[in-house]
Amino acid sequence: MNTIRFTALSVLLSFGIFLEANNSGLISMSKNYSADSCMVYNPDITLIQNKDINVEADLLSFDENNAVSLKNNVLIDFPGGSLSSSEALISENKNLIQFEKDTKLSLENFFLQGQKGSFIRSSNNIEIQDGSIFLPFRGLKVNFSQLNGSLDNDLNFKDAIISSCMNPSDGWLIGANEVGLNNETYRGYAKNITLKIKGISVFKAPYMPFATTNERLSGFLEPTLSSSSDGVDFSVPYFAILSDHSDITLALRNIAERGSGIELNYRYIKEHTKNNIDAFYFNSDKKMQKNFPEQTNSRWAYKIQDSLMLNNSSGMNWGEIVINWGEASDAMVLRDIPGEITSVGMQRDHYLNQNVKIHSSFKNFQISLEHQGYQTLNPLLTNGYKKSPSINVNFSKRINSVNIKHKLNITNFEANNLHEFFGASSSMGKYLAIIEDPIEGRRTYSDLTFSKQFIKNIFNIDASIGLKSLSYDLNSHKLANNNIHSPNAIINVSSIFLKNNKNGFSSIQPRLLIGFSQYKDQAGNPVFDSDLVSYNNQVFENNRFSGMDRISDEANHSIGFAYKVNKYNRDVLKFTFAKKYTHSDNKVYLSNPNMVNPHKKKFIMSSMWMPNMNNSLKIYGGFDNKDDKLHIGGINFLTKSSLGTLGVAKRYRRMAGNFRQTLNYSEIYTSINIRDGFKIIGKFQHDNEYDVKIQSMIGLEYENCCIALRIIGSDKNLTRYNDLYNSSYTYINDAWDNMINIENKSRINFEFELKGFSASVNKLDRMLQDSLLNY
């Protein structure tokens, strides 16, 4: 082959020197099944610093207009791109390039192929027949019979085939009579389309819009489709960008057995502000009206989550306003209508928060003002107490080597009505369904502490003394409450022994805690927000109660140690053991003296083994020597390999919740890689105490680099209420026994994703949120 290199062509046309380029291998294939695109663009664009172009060809000639004709093995390099072809013609001003046969045009953001056409460099106008274009931003390839337009704005295609698959017959393709792309708005449309998957036509439409970039764009999102015990559930979401900092998603939704409604998600994010609003509204609910004819109202729910940093003009932060407020039309709406694009709450949530908090810091002070309330999602229970307002003032200062801390809380408690709960039952095991005139009033709590830390030989010693105070100002109740002041003291002694090993270290940390808190009679004081601290959190604490309605009486000591092995800056083994000895019987209780914690010798242990990032085992438990019973325990086992993932979890608590019920749950989760992108996913939760299924989920997923298909079936046992508004029961226990049974709620979700063309929200993430492996 006689290759002519025009190193002297600058005398005639100022083309400059030749730079070798290579058009082979510009598009490579991704072999990862979960990749976002099958094709990866590797542009080989010669970096030319001026406006000249460089050419190479077997044959060269000039016509009467001084245009350069090139034939055989043509290669043209120019600023921002390169072109290879069998034949090409370059105009005298080097602006127009015409080409024929086996042409490849490589640009920074596009790769084009074709049999005949032209390209104007100054305007990026292009015409091609029988070719293709690759859009690297989405990994899309468009074959066409004819293309014309400008690469800077509008492109028009005739007889187009769109796909992100190297072999569309094994994946997906969309055939269209006409396709338009706008490279300024990054939007496109297709007319008279046919969608084929694995060569089978599955969908036809006269018109379909789509995006040509991964950036945020307004427009319709992929519809969602599922089938449940409430019939077919179908929604069409629309996403709109309101500004650089905000967007909104609206979805029209229809549930066959319930009716039509709308969902909304609004987001606003800026440097000092984060706002999220989720809401849905159904004007009526056919199934609700059938089961409860007296209820004909609309059903809705919303949740507002907002945070605003309070900054002055100089940028100094004065504090923050935080809002977490949710409300629902009725207690059962989230159970009956789970969100599709919204996250107001989950089907098993017990309440919605209704909180507003303002807090600030000034030198040694932290101050907050708060409203805290709830809406119950259990129709048998009331909304409980509201804290409005609740004022917190925290002071901390170090004087010489002494740390001084003072916490002051003043809270007003209000309630229209109240149900009884643990610590406030009328008789053993019986809880009033309604207290029409509950105790209300203001509570003042103070905690003053002086502490000092010092090192004695190999021991770290933290010693503190303090005074806790509690007083009440109750409204219209002649309750013999006691204003109390209780001194307390804590000595915490610890040490650490290190041994350096190859690639890491091991350590042992022994610990001793001695605690004392003087007994004060609090039998007449109300219980607004307190409960027993969970068993495993009592060992190294000098308090048995959460909240501020009780000051615990304590005379105890706890001993324990923690052993740890660290390799490559990662903990591979942990083991902790602790035991608490109570030296005298506790006399402070909530409201029932029979519920005083009897455990005088309790111990807890926990361990974690994680030899590598793919395998882990975690175990914890709490045991009492006096009754020889396990009070709390849990196991997590997780392993990953090329075959898939397996997780096993177990949770046990002897007394949990307001009614002190035994919780005994287990779960198995698995994700099995079958072959060539196929995967089976399953999750099964079981209540071992009552031997009933809680929830099961199984799904089949196929994914390769251009398509993802998922079919997910879920099955839940949820509480069903025979009469939502029956108030004839005196005790919650009786209402629970007579009004509640179990209802099975099943659902099948269908998901698909045409990679590069569409995007699908993987609902598996939401379905796995309540996995025991997360707790």
Residue spans for each PLM region:
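A residue-level signal for conserved active-site and pocket-lining positions in enzyme catalytic cores
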Residues: I17, L250, I358, V393, ...
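Outer-membrane beta-barrel transmembrane strands
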Residues: V236-A240, W325, Q347, Q354-S360, ...
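Classical Sec-dependent N-terminal signal peptides that target proteins to the secretory pathway
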Residues: N2-N23
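Short, solvent-exposed loop/turn segments at the edges of secondary structure
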Residues: A8, L19, R299, Y351, ...
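Carboxylate/His-rich catalytic cores and anion/metal-binding grooves
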Residues: E184-P209, N214-F220, W318-E320, N364, ...
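Outer-membrane beta-barrel translocator/pore domains, especially the C-terminal barrels
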Residues: Q115, N125-E127, N148, D154, ...
